[in-house]
UniProtKB/Swiss-Prot annotation:
It catalyses: Hydrolysis of DNA containing ring-opened 7-methylguanine residues, releasing 2,6-diamino-4-hydroxy-5-(N-methyl)formamidopyrimidine; 2'-deoxyribonucleotide-(2'-deoxyribose 5'-phosphate)-2'-deoxyribonucleotide-DNA = a 3'-end 2'-deoxyribonucleotide-(2,3-dehydro-2,3-deoxyribose 5'-phosphate)-DNA + a 5'-end 5'-phospho-2'-deoxyribonucleoside-DNA + H(+). Involved in base excision repair of DNA damaged by oxidation or by mutagenic agents. Acts as a DNA glycosylase that recognizes and removes damaged bases. Has a preference for oxidized purines, such as 7,8-dihydro-8-oxoguanine (8-oxoG). Has AP (apurinic/apyrimidinic) lyase activity and introduces nicks in the DNA strand. Cleaves the DNA backbone by beta-delta elimination to generate a single-strand break at the site of the removed base with both 3'- and 5'-phosphates. GO terms for biological process: base-excision repair. GO terms for molecular function: 8-oxo-7,8-dihydroguanine DNA N-glycosylase activity; class I DNA-(apurinic or apyrimidinic site) endonuclease activity; damaged DNA binding; zinc ion binding. Belongs to the FPG family. Keywords: DNA damage, DNA repair, DNA-binding, Glycosidase, Hydrolase, Lyase, Metal-binding, Multifunctional enzyme, Zinc, Zinc-finger. It holds the Pfam family H2TH. Monomer. Signal peptide: none annotated. This is Formamidopyrimidine-DNA glycosylase. It comes from Listeria innocua serovar 6a (strain ATCC BAA-680 / CLIP 11262).
Length: 273
């Protein structure tokens, strides 16, 4: 699933491509992908509106239109492509926004897990999807004091806590593994067993890793590309995720993989305690 760095790069490329385009037709080929509003109402609300900006909150893309905002979650395989109206529509194209300039923004999703919903303009914070999201890790709202408070009051594994979008928005499986490794903390450690120094290391690792991942275009470990079809580069920086059996870059101990709450979890058994 694309995490915050990947979604941010999709946002940035879309921001270059679609503002100023006016929607004159919306085609929904898979109705279940439209949530919170009947698909026909979704279509009715969008026709005639102009895209003004593309924002992001956590793993959600936010399209600000003339009178409303669209929330879109890519889930596992969702992708946006800006194409000419005459280009072939593939079988994995499920939602099409047709513009007056004869281009189309197409949403493709092999798994059909992606979702879209429409809300009042700038009203995303009132939706069930977003109202409980925690702070963005690369903003001043992400503070050590609040992060430490959240960590100390849960006995869940620290990796599980990092994946809780109420604690910090946008961290997923890949970056949670990398954060724990950078902080030298075993992913199975109970969050409330961590010392203040360990919590601080995790906090700083979250900021530094997410910053670099955004700068490098995210991680392409499966099929991720941005909305211009470009691969991410941070996968070349990964130290534990997907490295099962490979030597730790610090001590040489083989990286291990376990299941933690159903998630594949990678770590160095020597460096992470």
């Amino acid at each position: 699933m694309p995490e915050m760095p990947e979604v941010e790069n999709v946002r940035a490329t879309l921001q270059e491509l679609v503002p100023g385009k006016k929607i004159d037709q919306v085609i929904v080929r898979v109705p279940k992908m439209i949530v919170a509003t009947p698909p026909d109402e979704f279509v009715h609300m969008l026709v005639g509106q102009e895209i003004e900006a593309v924002r992001r909150r956590g793993k959600f893309l936010l399209f600000d239109l003339t009178n409303c905002t669209i929330l879109s979650h890519l889930r596992m395989e969702g992708k946006f492509r800006l194409m000419d109206e005459n280009e072939e529509v593939t079988k994995h194209t499920h939602i099409i926004f047709h513009f007056e300039d004869h281009t189309e923004l197409r949403f493709l999703d092999v798994r059909k897990f992606g979702t879209m919903e429409v809300t009042n303009k700038y009203g995303e914070s009132e939706t069930k999807s977003i109202k409980k999201l925690g702070p963005e890790p690369l903003t001043p709202a992400f503070t050590l004091a609040d992060f430490a408070t959240g960590v100390k009051k849960t006995s869940r594994a620290i990796k599980t806590a990092l994946l809780d979008q109420k604690l910090v928005a946008g961290v997923g499986n890949i970056y949670a593994d990398e954060i724990c490794f950078e902080a030298k903390v075993h992913p199975e450690r109970a969050a409330n067993s961590l010392s203040d120094k360990e919590i601080n290391r995790i906090f700083e690792a979250t900021k530094s890793i997410m910053t670099e991942a955004v700068a490098l275009g995210g991680s392409t470990v499966r099929t991720y590309v941005n909305s211009q079809g470009k691969l991410g580069q941070y996968q070349d920086k990964l130290k534990v995720y997907g490295k099962t059996g490979e030597p730790c870059v610090i001590c040489g101990t083989p990286i291990e993989k376990i299941k933690l709450n159903g998630r594949g979890t990678h770590f160095c058994p020597h460096c992470q305690k």
